[in-house]
Amino acid sequence: MDAIVVSKADRTPRLVDRPRPDPTPGSVLVRTLRVGVDGTDHEVIAGTHGGFPEDADELVLGHEAIGVVADPTDTRFSAGQLVAPTVRRPRGDPTPQFDRGQPDMAAPGTYVERGIDGADGFMADYFTSPADALVALPDSLAAHGFLTEPVSVAEKAIELALASRSAFDWRPDSALVLGNGSLGLLTLAILAARDDTETLYCLGRRSRPDPTIDIIERLGATYIDSRTTPVADIPAAHQPVDMVYEATGHAKHAFDAIDALAPAGVAALLGVPAAGWTFEVPGSDLHRSLVLENKAVVGSVNSNARHFRAAADTLAALPDWLCDAIVTGVHDTAAFADAFRDGETSIKTAVQFDTR
C-alpha cells in the first residue's frame, strides 16, 4: 500500500510502499480517505517536534484523518462506517488517564502520538486502530471529517476555559483568537456560533486582500493586524476581552494575553513555542493583574474521544461555506507534495487516499 513517510536519513516526505496492516482482535482496519496537514506535521518534518517509532528509521506522517471501516473484526463497528481516529496511545502499560478515557491528560513520556511522536500515523492507504480510539462520524462528513481532530482540540480548550470560570456567574460576551491559521479560524467559527459571544476579534499577520481575512469578516469578527496593533494594545484600540484563545505558538503571546483580558477573563494557550527563547516580562504586574482582577490562564493540548464526538456535532453544524473556504487544497497521492507547500492563499490542505 502507499504510505507517506519521513526518515532519519531524509526529512523530505516521500511516498513508499508498505505492507497493509492486519487488525488484531479488538482493533479495526480502516481504509483511509483524507488526512489533513497542519503546523505540527511541518515541525515533525523539520525534526523540531516528535520522534520516530522505537527501532524504526521511518515515520508515517499524519494525525488528522478520516476513513472507512474495512474490517471491524470483533468490535462494535460495521464495515463501511465512517470513522476518525484519536491521536494518543499508551507507551507501554496504560496509565490511569488512559483507563479513564482521558489520554489527553496523560503525562509526557507515558504516551505516543500517531504520526507525531513514537508511532506511525495515518497517511497510508490503510491503518489499524483500537476500537476505543475511533469515533464514528455521519456520512455527511466524508469530505471534511479530517477536520474533526483540530476541532476537537478547540473543543477541549474552550471547555477548560469555561470550567475555570465555573465557580461564579461568568457571562462572557467577547473573545479574541490569536492566529488566523486553520485552527484559529475553526475556533473563531465555534465561538461565533455561541449565543453569548457578541464581539469577536481575530489577530493575524496577513495583508489584504487575503482569504483568511475574508473568512474572519464573514464570520462577523474584526480582523486585527498584529504588525500595527500588538496583543497588549488591543484593550486600548478595541476593548479588553473575556476570553483569549492563543493558537500562534508565539511565546510572548502567553503573557500579552493577560494584558488583553478583561477582569475575570481567561486565556487558553494551545500553541507550542520552540524551546530556548528567553525574554523579559513585567512579572509583578502580570501577577498583580491575575490576582486582583481574578484572571486565569489555562494550557491545553490534544483531546479525547468525547471531544471528538463534540467536534463531529460542531462540524456538522458549521455553515456550509466555511469548510470549503478553509480547505484550500486536496491533493491525491500522485501530487502529495503539494499538500506540504505553503502558499500565500493556502489555509488548510489534505492528502486524499481514496473516496467514499
UniProtKB/Swiss-Prot annotation:
It comes from the Archaea. SUPFAM superfamilies: GroES-like, NAD(P)-binding Rossmann-fold domains. Gene3D superfamilies: Medium-chain alcohol dehydrogenases, catalytic domain (3.90.180.10), NAD(P)-binding Rossmann-like Domain (3.40.50.720). Disulfide bonds: none annotated. Its EC number is 1.1.1.47. Residues 1-26, 86-107 are annotated as: Disordered. Its cofactor is Zn(2+). Transmembrane segments: none annotated. Belongs to the zinc-containing alcohol dehydrogenase family. Glucose 1-dehydrogenase subfamily. Catalyzes the NAD(P)(+)-dependent oxidation of D-glucose to D-gluconate via gluconolactone. Can utilize both NAD(+) and NADP(+) as electron acceptor. Is involved in the degradation of glucose through a modified Entner-Doudoroff pathway. This is Glucose 1-dehydrogenase. The lineage of its organism: Archaea, Methanobacteriati, Methanobacteriota, Stenosarchaea group, Halobacteria. The gene is gdh.
